[in-house]
Amino acid sequence: MSDLKTEAQDLQQEENALIALRKEKLAAERVKGNAFPNDFRRDSYCNDLQKQYADKTKEELEAAAIPVKVAGRIMLNRGSFMVIQDMTGRIQVYVNRKTLSEDTLAAVKTWDLGDIISAEGTLARSGKGDLYVEMTNVRLLTKSLRPLPDKHHGLTDTEQRYRQRYVDLMVNEETRHTFRVRSQVISHIRKFLIERDFLEVETPMLQTIPGGAAAKPFETHHNALDMAMFLRIAPELYLKRLVVGGFEKVFEINRNFRNEGVSTRHNPEFTMLEFYQAYADYRDNMDLTEELFRELAQLVLGSTDVPYGDKVFHFGEPFVRLSVFDSILKYNPELTAADLQDVDRAREIAKKAGAKVLGHEGLGKLQVMIFEELVEHKLEQPHFITEYPFEVSPLARRNDDNPAVTDRFELFIGGREIANAYSELNDAEDQAERFLAQVAEKDAGDDEAMHYDADFVRALEYGMPPTAGEGIGIDRLVMLLTNSPSIRDVILFPHMRPQA
């Protein structure tokens, strides 16, 4: 038997013994009466007190005798002093033998790390300068039956952190910070758009036709209607129906589902912002996106320089704007324009680069394959990549000067796609033709090609004003702003295989 396996068994036996002891303590609490009281109401948060009274001296606090009521989980227990943690941070509480009853003092000795307590008393400062609550009353509110990870081993196993996020949040301040930032980012995006007259809406999660993106959907069955349905891959077609209906500026922040691979950049369930504005084009969205990203960086980091791993992304500088075609030539100087304009040569280059070439792709699709294999990972600083071929942009408006490409961009930062946007196709007849072309692609073996959506075509036939739309991946954006290496680090409960 390996040493590691033996150590794991020993740790498990030790944990089981601690759990048994804690259950005995809970049983004793039950005998006393209500083991889980719910009549305590706090009036202060730990970190708020730390901030509010940071400049008060020991003498000033003693003279003021400021009464407080706090509650939290015991994270450290040093006998006379305990450290409790609430949603804002930590504070010390002092077990004063002069002000607490003998029964209370005896009970305190039985409490464990992880227990949740209430503490009432006055604020004071220690000789070392630490703020604490000198308790006049303290109670056990919730008995913790499982021990917290100890200081030596901690919760360092990445997979366990994802599976037991509740423990991860208890013991890792970095994790708590990440998800506070995530909430802050979403709140600011919402504020940013509402201030610009966008209306927040909700569109169906269950759809009869999965549309709005090139992706493989999750399929389910509606029992009452006896019909197949799909978890949405994108809200796009419903949001554009709302623009047709007269809601000229709309947005939605919600979940999308794509039945595809899992990686450090992909989770099958993810959060997306999509917004649409009438009487605007994709260039307007580029300007809006730059402004939003600068505000978010300043809000979260206090700077427009965004550190990520060993790199720093500069949000304060104008984002690079480069077409798909030109970016291939810029980052692959051994290739020529003639190479990219010949379908046979482009197919050869795409295959050599590692793309999955089926053999029926047109020139535009092959160019995008080459871009994805040879350019995408090289786009470190923010890049708006524009003029995607119409073959891979079935919902985007063709460019007036070059109908072979569309008025579309994707935003890349750190070699990752963060946003996708375009001037929307509002020609109903052109849209119908492109849907038919997508159906042909699906029949030829492309399981990410789109379905034909007759109702959406009908909506366009009523007339949609010139419109620009965009989708921004919230998870990848939060990864950047929190310097997180994996998408699982910014999703509270990422998808995992069940434990054996």
From Swiss-Prot:
EC no.?
A: 6.1.1.6
Quaternary assembly: Homodimer.
Which top EC class applies here?
Answer: ligase
- Transmembrane segments annotated in the record for this chain: none
* Cofactor(s) needed: Mg(2+)
* Cited CDD domains: LysRS_core, LysRS_N
Which N-terminal residues, if any, form the signal peptide? none
What subcellular compartments does it reside in? Cytoplasm
What's the family? Belongs to the class-II aminoacyl-tRNA synthetase family.
Enumerate the Gene Ontology biological process terms. lysyl-tRNA aminoacylation
Q: How is the cofactor bound?
A: Binds 3 Mg(2+) ions per subunit.
Binding-site residues, Mg(2+) 1: E410, E417
Tell me a GO cellular component.
Answer: cytosol
Q: Which GO terms describe its molecular function?
A: ATP binding; lysine-tRNA ligase activity; magnesium ion binding; tRNA binding
UniProt KW keywords: Aminoacyl-tRNA synthetase, ATP-binding, Cytoplasm, Ligase, Magnesium, Metal-binding, Nucleotide-binding, Protein biosynthesis
What this protein catalyses is: tRNA(Lys) + L-lysine + ATP = L-lysyl-tRNA(Lys) + AMP + diphosphate
| Entry protein name | Lysine--tRNA ligase
Q: Known SUPFAM superfamilies for this protein?
A: Class II aaRS and biotin synthetases (SSF55681), Nucleic acid-binding proteins (SSF50249)
- The residues listed in the UniProt record as binding Mg(2+) 2, with positions renumbered to this chain, are E417
